[in-house]
Amino acid sequence: MSISNWITTAYLITSTSFQPLYGSFSDALGRRNCLFFANGAFTIGCLACGFSKNIYMLSFMRALTGIGGGGLITLSTIVNSDVIPSSKRGIFQAFQNLLLGFGAICGASFGGTIASSIGWRWCFLIQVPISVISSILMNYYVPNQKEYNRQNSSIFQNPGKILRDIDVMGSILIITGLTLQLLYLSLGCSTSKLSWTSPSVLLLLVGSVIILLLFILHERKTSARAIIPMELVNSSYSVVVLSISILVGFASYAYLFTLPLFFQIVLGDSTAKAGLRLTIPSLFTPVGSLITGFSMSKYNCLRLLLYIGISLMFLGNFLFLFIEKTSPNWLIGLFLIPANLGQGITFPTTLFTFIFMFSKSDQATATSTLYLFRSIGSVWGVAISAGVIQLSFAGLLRSNLKGLLDENKIKKLIVQLSANSSYIGSLHGEVKNTVIKSFDEATKRAHLMSTLLSSLALILCILKDNLAKPKTRR
């Protein structure tokens, strides 16, 4: 695996692996304290990334940033659930998603411009003052939950009880199991000689499965605050909702992964232009969240919203299959809107469908559990889409270039393109057109998979409505 890939992979591994810990840990240590830790780790990580001396240090600091980043979204959602009544929860989640969407749009749209104009370091350093300001605001406005304040005036008042509450063994098992799984996905879809079926890579998957099974057994017996209480996931209804969350996470992140590649390689966009092309459609993601929030508060129509959101995601993924190199820009932008709007509706509705099944005291761990399953889906979505594109692209090149180049030149070209997609710019004539056409078809194959999984999520919605909700303590 290219060392440069670890810049992204390191963050992905730690953010996903540590994310499920924040629910139970914040129950034991306090929301405010854990939020300060997460924001501090994220801030220090971004600062260190900006001053990294080499790519190894940059990758390591991205891992530190991921430890904090994995908790920021989870804890902000949990804090909202603590202080906001359920009747108004949708509106506040809508505004949270609006701000999150605005930040994502800014990052996607201007990241390439910042990197190409004043340098990549500023993509990290620009986040530091924003994170410092958020810490100051947290100090004044974010309290610990009432249950924590009644039991502990500080984390040092009763350290023995707190240590008994923290599920240390469960934390080690889930972090190790998820890390091995993410390493399997990352190495399997890399451009090296390794693949998902390589014995050394398969060992990572086997190890991940064994350790995660041990984690489940441990969670059933632990006397500490479970990372994922089994009562949250032991009903058919809960399993179906979490499965929907995995599928929409897979489809949405596979979609976001393939779009920039398609724009840059098939349409010939620069990095900055590819980001800007996503700006207007991306605005519909927070719009979808606002629609969800106000509809929930006024009509209490979670079930209908989930159908609408997933249907729009399916439509958006399906429409992408018809985008061509010759498609006008206005039509491309129009075809991108449904998937973004659907994601904005689906993400909060799956969250509330799950956490509203449980009592207020269980909603922190329920939130982190759902976010974990969604994150797993997103990681699998990106990794499998990358694998499908790579395998399809290589196969199509061998087939389509057979009459233009000899076998050795085709193999050499595949290696060069796998290592650096910008190598396409040095090609000419029929060879270049064939390479672009092959990549177009490869991305469409990956996107067809996302379309099918979106339809499967829709089928599970129908199945969910025929299942009884679990009876939980209130």
Curated annotation (Swiss-Prot):
Residues 55-62, 119-121, 189-196, 260-273, 325-331, 397-447 are vacuolar. It comes from the Eukaryota. The keyword Lipid biosynthesis does not apply. It holds the Pfam family MFS_1. It is a multi-pass membrane protein. Keywords: Amino-acid transport, Glycoprotein, Membrane, Transmembrane, Transmembrane helix, Transport, Vacuole. SUPFAM superfamilies: MFS general substrate transporter. Its main location: membrane. One of its GO terms (biological process) is basic amino acid transport. Glycans are attached at N420. GO terms for molecular function: basic amino acid transmembrane transporter activity. The keyword Transferase does not apply. GO terms for cellular component: endoplasmic reticulum; fungal-type vacuole membrane. The chain crosses the membrane at residues 34-54, 63-85, 98-118, 122-142, 168-188, 197-217, 239-259, 274-294, 304-324, 332-352, 376-396, 448-468. It is found in: Vacuole membrane. InterPro entries: MFS, MFS_dom, MFS_trans_sf. Residues 1-33, 86-97, 143-167, 218-238, 295-303, 353-375, 469-474 are cytoplasmic. Belongs to the major facilitator superfamily. Transporter required for vacuolar uptake of histidine, arginine and lysine and to a lesser extent tyrosine. This is Vacuolar basic amino acid transporter 2.
